[in-house]
Amino acid sequence: MMEKTYPGDITRVHGIRVGHAQNASARTGVTVVLCRKEGATGGVSVRGAAPGTRETDLLRPGNLVENVNAVVLSGGSAYGLDAAGGVMRYLEQMACGMDMGVARVPIVPA
Protein backbone atom coordinates (compact mmCIF):
# COMPACT_ATOMS: atom_id res chain seq x y z
CA MET A 1 0.00 0.00 0.00
CA MET A 2 1.38 3.38 -1.00
CA GLU A 3 1.56 6.00 1.73
CA LYS A 4 -0.19 9.29 1.10
CA THR A 5 2.09 12.16 0.15
CA TYR A 6 1.45 15.85 0.55
CA PRO A 7 2.53 18.90 -1.46
CA GLY A 8 6.03 19.85 -0.36
CA ASP A 9 6.97 16.38 0.93
CA ILE A 10 10.66 15.69 0.39
CA THR A 11 9.77 12.31 -1.11
CA ARG A 12 8.03 14.12 -3.98
CA VAL A 13 11.39 15.49 -5.15
CA HIS A 14 12.68 13.48 -8.13
CA GLY A 15 15.68 11.35 -7.17
CA ILE A 16 15.17 11.59 -3.40
CA ARG A 17 14.35 8.56 -1.24
CA VAL A 18 13.85 8.62 2.53
CA GLY A 19 14.02 5.84 5.10
CA HIS A 20 13.48 5.94 8.86
CA ALA A 21 13.89 3.56 11.79
CA GLN A 22 13.43 4.15 15.49
CA ASN A 23 13.65 2.53 18.89
CA ALA A 24 10.98 4.23 20.96
CA SER A 25 12.02 2.67 24.27
CA ALA A 26 15.61 3.86 23.77
CA ARG A 27 14.32 7.24 22.54
CA THR A 28 16.51 7.21 19.46
CA GLY A 29 16.16 6.85 15.73
CA VAL A 30 17.70 7.50 12.36
CA THR A 31 16.46 9.04 9.12
CA VAL A 32 18.40 8.66 5.87
CA VAL A 33 17.85 10.87 2.85
CA LEU A 34 19.32 9.20 -0.25
CA CYS A 35 20.04 11.35 -3.30
CA ARG A 36 20.15 10.32 -6.93
CA LYS A 37 23.33 8.53 -8.01
CA GLU A 38 25.19 11.67 -9.10
CA GLY A 39 24.42 13.36 -5.77
CA ALA A 40 22.78 16.64 -4.85
CA THR A 41 23.93 20.00 -3.56
CA GLY A 42 23.98 19.99 0.23
CA GLY A 43 23.96 22.64 2.93
CA VAL A 44 23.99 22.60 6.71
CA SER A 45 23.06 24.66 9.74
CA VAL A 46 24.41 23.18 12.97
CA ARG A 47 22.54 24.27 16.10
CA GLY A 48 22.04 23.25 19.68
CA ALA A 49 23.93 23.20 22.96
CA ALA A 50 25.98 20.07 22.24
CA PRO A 51 25.72 19.17 18.55
CA GLY A 52 27.59 16.21 17.13
CA THR A 53 28.33 16.10 13.43
CA ARG A 54 30.21 14.05 10.87
CA GLU A 55 31.51 15.42 7.55
CA THR A 56 29.38 18.60 7.72
CA ASP A 57 32.45 20.80 7.15
CA LEU A 58 32.56 19.37 3.63
CA LEU A 59 29.42 21.37 2.88
CA ARG A 60 31.05 24.76 3.39
CA PRO A 61 31.32 26.85 0.21
CA GLY A 62 34.73 26.69 -1.44
CA ASN A 63 35.49 23.10 -0.48
CA LEU A 64 36.28 20.37 -3.02
CA VAL A 65 33.03 18.47 -2.40
CA GLU A 66 30.16 19.78 -4.51
CA ASN A 67 27.53 17.07 -3.96
CA VAL A 68 26.34 14.72 -1.24
CA ASN A 69 25.04 11.21 -1.84
CA ALA A 70 22.99 10.99 1.34
CA VAL A 71 22.30 12.79 4.61
CA VAL A 72 21.90 10.95 7.92
CA LEU A 73 19.84 12.48 10.74
CA SER A 74 20.32 10.48 13.90
CA GLY A 75 19.97 10.37 17.64
CA GLY A 76 22.05 8.45 20.11
CA SER A 77 25.17 10.63 20.16
CA ALA A 78 28.34 9.09 18.67
CA TYR A 79 26.56 5.77 18.05
CA GLY A 80 23.94 7.57 16.00
CA LEU A 81 26.61 9.32 13.94
CA ASP A 82 28.15 5.93 13.17
CA ALA A 83 24.99 5.06 11.22
CA ALA A 84 26.51 7.11 8.39
CA GLY A 85 29.16 4.37 8.03
CA GLY A 86 26.49 1.84 7.13
CA VAL A 87 25.00 4.22 4.58
CA MET A 88 28.48 4.75 3.10
CA ARG A 89 29.00 0.99 2.74
CA TYR A 90 25.65 0.64 0.99
CA LEU A 91 26.40 3.50 -1.41
CA GLU A 92 29.87 2.10 -2.09
CA GLN A 93 28.26 -1.19 -3.17
CA MET A 94 26.00 0.82 -5.48
CA ALA A 95 29.06 2.60 -7.01
CA CYS A 96 27.90 6.00 -5.73
CA GLY A 97 30.26 8.68 -4.52
CA MET A 98 32.92 11.16 -5.42
CA ASP A 99 35.25 9.73 -8.07
CA MET A 100 38.77 9.67 -6.64
CA GLY A 101 40.28 7.81 -9.60
CA VAL A 102 40.93 4.52 -7.82
CA ALA A 103 37.62 4.41 -5.93
CA ARG A 104 34.37 6.23 -5.35
CA VAL A 105 33.94 7.78 -1.91
CA PRO A 106 30.30 8.24 -0.83
CA ILE A 107 29.71 11.65 0.74
CA VAL A 108 27.36 11.18 3.70
CA PRO A 109 27.23 14.01 6.23
CA ALA A 110 25.49 13.32 9.53
Protein language model regions, located:
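Alpha/propeptide regions of enzymes that mature by internal proteolysis
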Residues: M1-A110
